């Protein structure tokens, strides 16, 4: 049985700001863009959360909820530097580290002999070492499988940890809300709720074939998670799945021509990011994203094995068909990156087709 730890830093960006600027401590703060520039909250501290402020919320709305909220501009270079220090701490205990972002990661400590081999004690030691090195607190979840470790890390925040032992799994997942499963967002959660599926026990009793027919491959994943199954290993060299860029506009725009005026800069920035972080990867789709002034969003995608500027403009036109008179506050473009397993499967299929053509 594996021993998996999920480490999640507590309100990371905001915590770094409070560490570096002590005068911010005890006050509601948020890291994000200015409200007069249509900024969005990246993260906020617990004082701000008491007022209902949340990540991804418009800064202007956050200020309405909490008029005394202090907006702090992000310092990404500092956050990356501290993140590197945190990952160095992880390496003191295991080489099997799967970063999910700057402030969270999975660790497989199954073979770690420190702390008597106890994952619970290892998590405590990691959190203490992070605090001594950076002055920041972290929360941890400990479980035999990844998705439960991630859920557990959120159960005793801030600066705490929660353990799910193997014999606890059946009872734990029985009453677990499906919305808590990583990958089940608001949209999927609503679809599940519409067919009477709220908890994992509800899903356990649902016909498997019907679930797969409705949700495809993700239906199979849901069936496994509802039974407390997750066979994924820690991936130290986790493949990036996409590269994208988006911009929140200073004012709502409404016409195709206005949107087209924003596209060249976005596409140029996307090209730069692809060269920087995915130049050797294979592209398999292009995506255009719009967020409207009611904060609902839509995406349009199309298969593509190379970046086509024309395709981005075609997708933009299709996305605007869903506008329904609403103003557009955000526009984004991205590409999906094929995984190595996808490429291998495609190559194997090509070989099979060639063999069939040759009469093998």
UniProtKB/Swiss-Prot annotation:
It holds the Pfam family IMS_HHH_1. The active site is at 104. Binds 2 magnesium ions per subunit. This is DNA polymerase IV. Mg(2+) binds at residues 8, 103. Gene3D superfamilies: 3.30.70.270, 3.40.1170.60, 5' to 3' exonuclease, C-terminal subdomain (1.10.150.20), DNA polymerase, Y-family, little finger domain (3.30.1490.100). One of its GO terms (cellular component) is cytosol. Belongs to the DNA polymerase type-Y family. It comes from the Bacteria. It is found in: Cytoplasm. Poorly processive, error-prone DNA polymerase involved in untargeted mutagenesis. Copies undamaged DNA at stalled replication forks, which arise in vivo from mismatched or misaligned primer ends. These misaligned primers can be extended by PolIV. Exhibits no 3'-5' exonuclease (proofreading) activity. May be involved in translesional synthesis, in conjunction with the beta clamp from PolIII. CDD domains: PolY_Pol_IV_kappa. Keywords: Cytoplasm, DNA damage, DNA repair, DNA replication, DNA-binding, DNA-directed DNA polymerase, Magnesium, Metal-binding, Mutator protein, Nucleotidyltransferase, Transferase. Its EC number is 2.7.7.7. It catalyses: DNA(n) + a 2'-deoxyribonucleoside 5'-triphosphate = DNA(n+1) + diphosphate. The keyword Magnesium applies. GO terms for biological process: DNA-templated DNA replication; error-prone translesion synthesis; SOS response. The record marks 13 as: Substrate discrimination. Its cofactor is Mg(2+). Monomer. GO terms for molecular function: damaged DNA binding; DNA-directed DNA polymerase activity; magnesium ion binding.
């Amino acid at each position: 049985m594996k021993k998996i730890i999920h480490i999640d830093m507590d309100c990371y960006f905001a915590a770094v700001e409070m560490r570096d600027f002590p005068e911010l401590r005890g006050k509601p703060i948020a890291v994000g863009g200015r409200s007069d520039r249509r900024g969005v909250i990246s993260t906020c501290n617990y004082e701000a959360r008491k007022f209902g402020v949340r990540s991804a919320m418009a800064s202007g709305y956050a200020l309405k909820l909490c008029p005394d909220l202090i907006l702090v501009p992000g310092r990404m270079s500092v956050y990356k530097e501290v993140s590197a220090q945190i990952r160095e701490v992880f390496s003191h205990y295991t080489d099997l580290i799967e970063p999910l972002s700057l402030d969270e990661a999975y660790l497989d400590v199954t073979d770690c002999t420190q702390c008597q081999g106890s994952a619970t004690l290892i998590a405590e030691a990691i959190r203490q070492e992070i605090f001594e090195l950076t002055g920041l607190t972290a929360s941890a979840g400990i479980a035999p499988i990844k998705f439960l470790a991630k859920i557990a890390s959120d159960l005793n925040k801030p600066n705490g940890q929660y353990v799910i032992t193997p014999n606890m799994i059946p009872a734990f997942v029985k009453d677990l809300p499906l919305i808590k499963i990583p990958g089940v967002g608001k949209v999927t959660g609503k679809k599940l709720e519409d067919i009477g599926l709220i908890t994992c026990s509800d899903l356990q009793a649902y016909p498997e074939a019907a679930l797969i027919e409705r949700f495809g491959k993700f239906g199979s994943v849901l069936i496994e998670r509802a039974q407390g199954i997750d066979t994924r290993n820690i991936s130290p060299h986790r493949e990036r799945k996409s590269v994208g860029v988006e911009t929140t506009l200073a004012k709502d725009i409404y016409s195709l021509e206005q949107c087209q005026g924003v596209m060249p800069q976005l596409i140029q920035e996307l090209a730069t990011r692809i060269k920087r972080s995915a130049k050797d990867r294979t592209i398999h789709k292009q995506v255009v994203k719009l967020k409207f002034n009611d904060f609902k969003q839509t995406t349009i995608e199309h298969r593509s094995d190379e970046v086509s500027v024309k395709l981005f403009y075609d997708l933009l036109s299709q996305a605007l068909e869903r506008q329904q008179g609403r103003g557009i506050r955000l526009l984004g473009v991205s590409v999906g990156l094929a995984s190595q397993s996808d490429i291998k499967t495609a190559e194997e299929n090509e070989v099979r087709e060639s063999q069939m053509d040759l009469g093998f």
